[in-house]
Amino acid sequence: MQLNIVLVELEIPQNTGNIARTCAATGSRLHIVKPMGFTIDDRKLKRAGLDYWHLLDITYYENLADFFEKNAGGKFFYFSTKAEHIHSDVVYPNNAYIVFGKETKGLPEELLHDNPDRCVRIPMINNSDARSLNLSNSVAVGVYEVLRQWGYPELLTKGKLTKFDWDE
């Protein structure tokens, strides 16, 4: 099973680095749609991703049209504070694409309007001062919901202590 994370028009390098680390740790593919508000060799981006960059399967696209053209037939789910469906109420199929917009504006409303049944939101309090979650946190919530539904394929689900055994 393959999970695809799509980031559209990113603005903050640290978020991208954190998301890249999440993708590396979960085996998810990362798709980045330009333009971006920073360069991919940005020092802050590299630091946030630590030494996980070699574990990434990452593809860049010039714009949304380029992305959709190269991923025709994909099963897309659009995360947005404007959506009417809760992210955990959706059943995510194999090879799903979970799509996130830029930090300041989210995804284009035309895209959301044209795909109402594929738009999902992470529940939050009803307070206009709490506009949204941090992008990297939202991606992590989305990724782990999909992986939970899939039974955490190929992920370690039990840890080990360094000084003790759990059975002692």
Task: Report the location of each language-model feature.
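Post-transcriptional modification and biogenesis factors for structured RNAs
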Residues: 1-168
